[in-house]
Amino acid sequence: MAAALLLVACARPYVSPLAPPPHRDEITAGYDAAWAAIVRALAKENVALRAIARDSGVIASDDFVAPIGVYADCGRIGDDLLEGEALVSFTLFVEPNGTHTNVQINSRMRTHMYRRGGSGKFRPTPVFQCASTGRFEANLLDTVRELVRH
């Protein structure tokens, strides 16, 4: 019993990252051109789609694996950042706004295989929630803007 209490007392707390709000942006193109560019940009990134509904403006990706730190911030345990892989998915909401198109990107992320810091064995559990770094969203919308220009 004393050993268990000592182990718990020495355990470092998990510090989760602050979740950012959904990424919102405006594309300076009509809905049809923006929609086509978004679909092409997702295909260029090789993102598998679970659902795509042009009439309602919703695109949902399947979960895909990404290195922690690229698209996902998974926090830390004590002073050690979590490293490894995260499962990430995105849902895009696209709606016309006159001659422009509004896009909102929601993200969902969790650890897949991780370790504390740069050493140790990778493990799948416990699963920790992660927050978006904003990199996927920014890169995707940059690609969309480039595609609507051409």
What does each of the following model-derived ranges do?
Residues 11-150:
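Ser/Thr-rich, low-complexity intrinsically disordered terminal regions
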Residues 6-9:
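C-terminal motif of bacterial Sec signal peptides marking the signal peptidase cleavage site
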